[in-house]
Design a protein with these regions (language model features):
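Conserved short alpha-helical segments that host acidic/polar catalytic motifs at enzyme active sites
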Residues: 1-270
Length: 270
């Protein structure tokens, strides 16, 4: 696909793909695109090019069409000598956070060398109809996860559609206000060997304009990018109900008891 757009993306895992919801206003959009390109280069990566994502807005309802963003993909080259995978994704994460803090008009759906998120204000049955990429037989992935969720605590929007970058989760997090407040309080003492000189670029961790699911996603993503394995990060943020479980192994209880001193549960019925 990119050959027809005039740029090469290189070998597998040698590039990252960003999915963007840009404003429809052409001037604002071009300024945002240029800003992202500058940030990518400043972070030591190569910006390869843009691609307008082919869509079928005619299948959407009137409200979804009225607020539909301009959807584009940006391609970023991995720095020479950098390991593929999480090391590269961590660099992309830093670039995304810098961009998000300098541009409030654009929503970065995903930016990764391993995953691409397709989502919007439509039903699951309309996903492949709206994104023609997903109808292409040459489009291959090791796994695909699909999730549908109607807004209950927040108004529906393209940005708040599911899934998010790391999680597929129904939300309904009853403890969200306390969770967010405590994450904010921890930021002054945050340290990570992976963000030794870049911690200020990724803070604040939580975008409080997002839904409860989005804010959990922010926290989980930060923990993984800071060096915690994903399964552990999930067990720390959403622990099993261990305290009163008389059948749970004592070592497992000790595990949850230990991590409960570091992170309160993001709790809810879902």
């Amino acid at each position: 696909v990119t050959e027809h757009l005039g740029f090469q993306i290189g070998d597998e895992r040698a590039y990252g793909v960003g999915m963007f919801f840009f404003p429809q206003d052409e001037l604002i959009r071009s300024q945002a695109m240029k800003m992202f390109e500058i940030i990518v280069r400043k972070e030591g990566m190569t910006f390869l090019g843009w691609r307008e994502v082919p869509t079928a807005p005619e299948i959407l309802g009137r409200k979804a069409v009225d607020v539909m963003p301009y959807i584009a993909q940006g391609f970023v080259g991995k720095p020479a000598g950098m390991k593929a995978g999480l090391d590269f994704d961590r660099k992309l994460y830093i670039a995304r956070r810098v961009f998000e803090q300098s541009n409030e008009d654009t929503y970065v759906v995903s930016l990764s060398s391993r995953t691409i998120v397709y989502k919007g204000m439509f039903l699951v049955s309309e996903l492949r109809l709206f994104f023609s990429d997903l109808q292409d037989e040459d489009y291959k992935s090791a796994i695909a996860i699909v999730h549908s969720r109607f807004s209950t605590n927040t108004n529906p929007s393209w940005m708040r559609a599911h899934p998010y970058r790391f999680i597929v989760h129904n939300g309904e997090i009853n403890t969200i206000r306390g969770n967010v407040d405590k994450m904010v309080a921890r930021e002054e003492n945050m340290e990570s060997e992976y963000f030794r000189y870049d911690m200020h670029k990724v803070l604040p961790i939580i975008n409080q304009e997002g839904s409860d699911s989005a804010m959990l996603d922010n926290a989980l993503e930060f923990m993984v990018m800071s060096g915690m394995d994903l399964p552990l990060a999930v067990m720390v943020t959403i622990p099993a109900p261990w305290e009163n479980d008389k059948y749970m192994d004592s070592e497992i209880k000790d595990f949850y008891r230990y991590y409960a001193t570091m992170m309160e549960p993001w709790d809810g019925p879902a």
